[in-house]
A protein has these predicted regions:
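Catalytic cores of DNA base-excision repair glycosylases
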Residues: 3, 9-230
Length: 231
């Protein structure tokens, strides 16, 4: 099995990590030249809320729920006028509604108190908000403000291991390895491209490291399922 890189034919049976990185980068750019943001939003605040709601929930479900929420409140000033229970009743289909509704209400209060109602374009400041972890903050920094980050969730963690890009034991270590492997200007697009590819070709159950194009190109001799470290 061979692929073209820089005009040269390369034997995929002997891919180095650098060659795997180059091939994966090339292939994902070819498959997904455009990287639309999957969560519907109109500004940094609505994106922040949508990303928070997407924890353990599909983007499709979030996009079904947020119109009803944002019709009532699409800014911190309006959100704090709703009760936690009102928020909870709207977002219930997204799951974890008791925790998420409290976080949405409280972070809206803090944005008004500490940031004049604006979502801060600062990773550390975002991580201080209720319900906002490193991955959520990284997504907001990348998609709302265009700052180079490489948000890694369990799905990206799994694919990075299948593709031999990391031996990370968790998403923190995998994020570190991916940032080292790819140029900074590719981080934001790659985050989305890997997600798109994983959903379409390298699914959790549909590919065990021996099925999809990237897995078979990078590891044509792999005979056993690739076991991935869980986060």
């Amino acid at each position: 099995m061979q692929f073209i890189r820089g005009g040269k034919l390369t034997d995929a049976n002997n891919l180095s990590k650098a060659q795997r990185v180059a091939y994966i980068d090339e292939r994902l750019q070819a498959l997904y030249p455009e990287t639309p943001i999957p969560l519907d939003h109109s500004d940094p605040y609505t994106l922040l809320i949508a990303v928070l709601l997407s924890a353990q929930c599909t983007d499709e479900r979030v996009n079904q729920v947020t119109p009803a929420l944002f019709t009532k409140a699409d800014c911190p000033e309006q959100m704090i006028q709703l009760s936690v229970e009102e928020i909870r009743s709207i977002i219930r289909p997204c799951g974890l509604s008791p925790q998420k509704s409290k976080a949405i209400h409280r972070l809206s209060e803090l944005l008004l108190a500490d940031h004049s109602g604006a979502v801060p374009a600062n990773l550390e400041a975002l991580e201080q908000l209720p319900g906002v972890g490193h991955k959520t903050a990284s997504v907001v920094m990348a998609q709302a403000f265009g700052m180079p980050t490489f948000p890694v969730d369990t799905h990206i963690h799994r694919l990075a291991q299948r593709w031999g890009l990391t031996r990370g034991r968790n998403v923190v270590e995998t994020e570190r390895d991916l940032k080292r492997a790819f140029p900074k200007e590719r981080w934001n697009a790659l985050h989305l491209q890997i997600i798109y590819y994983g959903r379409e070709y390298c699914t959790a159950r549909g590919c065990d490291g021996r099925v999809c194009e990237i897995c078979t190109t990078c590891y044509p001799a792999r005979k056993h399922p690739k076991r991935c470290n869980k986060t």
